Amino acid sequence: MDIIQKSIFNSGPHSRGIYEPPLGYFTPYNTPPYIAAYSDSGSWLADHHQHHQQQHQQHQQQMQHIRFPTPPITPPRPIAGYGYRQRTQSVIMKARGQQDELCRSPVEFPDDSKSCSSSSECGTASDFVCNWTDCDRVFDTLDALAQHVTQRHAIASLTDGLYYCRWRGCQRSERGFNARYKMLVHTRTHTKEKPHRCHLCEKSFSRAENLKIHIRSHSGEKPYKCSFEGCQKAYSNSSDRFKHTRTHSMEKPYMCKVAGCQKRYTDPSSLRKHVKTFKHSIHLIASQPLTLPSVPCLLEASSESAFTCLPAASSVESTSSSSSARYYDDSNNEPSDYSLKPKQDAEFSPSYWLGDRQHSYLHSEDFFVKMDVESPLDLRIHRI
C-alpha cells in the first residue's frame, strides 16, 4: 500500500478503519480491493490472495470432473455454498439409483439357454460330484468343484514327490505328473472344466494354448510357415504344418486297403476322410428278403455318378427271371428304379475303373443292371 493510501486510511474520516479511496483513484489496470473493516493495513491483501486461491482450486476440481465424469462414491467437499452441494448430492443419488435399478432388474436369457451367469454354473447337482478316491462331495457349481480339487487333492506324494490323479476310472492313476499344473490340466478331463473362454464366440477350452490357437481362426494369423524351399503355405498350428511338410517327401505310410485302390497318405486323418468318400462307403441294404441271389453286374445309367456294383454271390441258382430294385444316390437323395435281367452272349473282360465320379468293377458274368420303372425291392446306398 503506497504512502497516499496509508495517509488516507489513517487520517480524517477514515480513521475508523474503513478504507474509501478517492474518486478516480482506480484505473483499468488496478483491481479494487474488498471494501471492509480491517484491523491491520495489510490484512485485506492476504484475504484477497486467499480468495483467488480458492477460485483456482474450484476451477481445477471442475476440470477434473469434466475429464473424469464418473460421480464419486462420497460427496465432495462443498466449495461454493449450499447450491453447489445440493446439485452434487442430486447427481450422486441419481447415479446410485441407476446402479440399484440395474442390480434389482432380472437378467433376461434366450428361450434356449439356461438362466445362469456362466456355463460353469449350469447343470444338476449330480454333475458336480468329486469322484476322487475316498471323496464323494457334491457341489453346486463347477467352479466350486474345480476349486475343491485344486486345493484339496492337488498335493504331491510324500514318497516320490509326483502328483497322482486318483479320480475313479482314470487310466493313468499310477503314472504321476512331475508338475502340479500338469495334473490340474489333466483333471479338467474329468471335471469338464473349461476356464479359458473365447471373447469373440461362445467356445471354451481347458488349456490356454488351445484358446490361443482358436483365436487365430478369428484373426487369420498363420505363424507356422512351411520351411520347404519355394513353398509359401502357412498354418495356425504346428501339427498342421507337420502334416503338410510330409507331402514334400515320399513318405506316405498310410495306404488305402480297399481292393484296387492305390491311394496313400501321410497321416491317418486324411486316410479316414478318403475311406468315407462315396467311392468306398457304398452299402446296399435290402428292405425286403432277397428271393434271388446277388450276382456281379454293371449299372448302366445316363449319369456317370450312378456307377456302382452289386456284391457277388457264392452260387447262382436261377438266372432266367428278372428282379426289380431301387437305387438311392446320396448326391441328390432321389431314387432311381432299375431291374436285374439276364443278358445272353455278353462278353465283358474283367477290368477296373477309377475316375472322379465313378468307381466300379466289370465282370464276365452274364448279368447287368438296367434302369427301369419297377421297384418292389428297395436297396439303399448309405454313407459311413
From Swiss-Prot:
Location in the cell: Nucleus
Disulfide bonds, paired cysteine numbers: none
Any GO CC annotation of this UniProt entry: nucleus
InterPro entries documented for this protein: GLI-like, Znf-C2H2_ZIC1-5/GLI1-3-like, Znf_C2H2_sf, Znf_C2H2_type
UniProt keyword annotations, A-Z: Developmental protein, DNA-binding, Metal-binding, Nucleus, Repeat, Repressor, Transcription, Transcription regulation, Zinc, Zinc-finger
Induction data: Strongly and rapidly induced in larvae by maltose, trehalose, glucose, fructose or saccharose, but not by lactose or galactose.
Domain of life: Eukaryota
Pfam families: zf-C2H2, zf-C2H2_15
GO biological process: cellular response to nutrient; central nervous system development; negative regulation of DNA-templated transcription; negative regulation of transcription by RNA polymerase II; positive regulation of DNA-templated transcription; positive regulation of transcription by RNA polymerase II; response to starvation
Broad class of the protein's primary localization: nucleus
Residues covered by region (Disordered): 321-343
Gene Ontology molecular functions: DNA-binding transcription factor activity, RNA polymerase II-specific; RNA polymerase II cis-regulatory region sequence-specific DNA binding; zinc ion binding
C2H2-type zinc finger locations on the chain: 128-153, 163-190, 196-218, 224-248, 254-280
Family note: Belongs to the GLI C2H2-type zinc-finger protein family.
Record's function text: Transcription factor which represses a set of lipase genes involved in fat catabolism.
UniProt-recorded name of the protein: Zinc finger protein GLIS2 homolog
Species of the source: Drosophila melanogaster
Lineage of origin: Eukaryota, Metazoa, Ecdysozoa, Arthropoda, Hexapoda
Record gene name: sug
